[in-house]
Amino acid sequence: MQTLDDFAARRLSALEKRQLSRVLHETGRDSSPWVMRGERRMLSLSCNDYLNLSTHPATIRAAIDATAQFGVGAGGSRLVTGNHPLYTALEVRLAALKGTEAAIVFGSGFLANIGIIPALIAPNDLILVDELAHACIHAGAALAHARTIRFPHNDMQALAGLLEQERPQHDHVLIVTDGVFSMDGDLAPMSALVELSARYNAWLMTDDAHGIGVLNEGHGSAYGHDVPLQMGTLSKAVGAYGGYLCASAPVVALIRNRARSFIYTTGLPPGTLAAAITALDLIAADPALTMQPLEKAKLFTRLTSLPDAQSPIVPILLGSAEAALSASAMLAEHDYLAAAIRPPTVPAGTARLRLTFTALTPDSDIMRLAELIRPLLSDTAG
């Protein structure tokens, strides 16, 4: 009989043979976007701290002050004793930024998606998900126990065909997509999605984890569009931690009563809430700051003759896991931290470097990086 340890060892060995094994590397945060790997100070090209607000003096001070005043932890779930007054201030700011009636904050983006989708969708409903949407969206869809169909990435013709065929057979239909796709950096075709959802009486939900704070002067990828369910995170451009849903007041009230990942988990620490509030205030006060990550990414794509960046995320597709690991190691020799992204995070044959640019990524380093990346592009083209 195979023991648990034998089972684990065999599975790990199989991953290692395919160069898909993961290990944790201790990475100290310096002043964003700089990190420490051991004694080496490296420029991070893999961090989602797009506005560098996680190390901003104002957010740090807000977290320190709130922790000193209110303590380290929430002490309970939000529906019992963990609903600190700072939550109200945070949710008011989120709703204002996103242009909705209300907002609700979760413990993380993953918790938000696995709570929101099952709270809205029943087994006799239908979920249509972009095939490249984040893993937590697919996890949330699975928990709803409804029929789920993945449509080809950003293919509105295919989505329209599915809606035409499937809509009459289901009580409700939920279309879910990333606003900014986390591994490719491209944007969802928001206007077309809104039009299709209206035409077929479907609900549209977008995950704006990588759009809030950096697109449309910080409002995110859904700004100016009628998107009733705007989900996102506070852990990237906002620089803190947590997830949220911005929606109408009735929808938020329903989620508060039905989302298990909201009900049965402890509230966020007061220091985290205070830091997020301060970060949102900084975003609202400085539209120019929100534009800088995309401007940095566009500089890089111009220098490398890549397609114009649509977000702060620029993928360098290399194909094999071995090629991605080799490219990552090469950049590390030049003090650039660019993690290799391999299956199952991305489809087989599309291993890559996922480069991210922040407001404080130096232009001089972007120019140097472009010189290092160009030979990789020539190799893949050939």
Swiss-Prot record:
Catalytic activity: 6-carboxyhexanoyl-[ACP] + L-alanine + H(+) = (8S)-8-amino-7-oxononanoate + holo-[ACP] + CO2
Cell inner membrane is among the record's keywords: no
Residues annotated for pyridoxal 5'-phosphate binding in this entry: 109-110, 182, 207-210, 233-236
UniProt keywords, alphabetically: Acyltransferase, Biotin biosynthesis, Pyridoxal phosphate, Transferase
Residues at which substrate binds: 22, 29, 134, 345
N6-(pyridoxal phosphate)lysine carried by residues: 236
Listed GO MF terms: 8-amino-7-oxononanoate synthase activity; pyridoxal phosphate binding
Pathway(s) the chain acts in: Cofactor biosynthesis; biotin biosynthesis
EC numbers for this chain: 2.3.1.47
PROSITE patterns hit by this protein: AA_TRANSFER_CLASS_2
Required cofactor(s): pyridoxal 5'-phosphate
Root EC class: transferase
PANTHER family: 8-AMINO-7-OXONONANOATE SYNTHASE, CLASS II AMINOTRANSFERASE/8-AMINO-7-OXONONANOATE SYNTHASE
Family: Belongs to the class-II pyridoxal-phosphate-dependent aminotransferase family. BioF subfamily.
Quaternary structure (record): Homodimer.
Summary of the function given for this chain in its UniProt record: Catalyzes the decarboxylative condensation of pimeloyl-[acyl-carrier protein] and L-alanine to produce 8-amino-7-oxononanoate (AON), [acyl-carrier protein], and carbon dioxide.
Protein name, per record: 8-amino-7-oxononanoate synthase
Naturally occurring in which organism (per UniProt): Granulibacter bethesdensis (strain ATCC BAA-1260 / CGDNIH1)
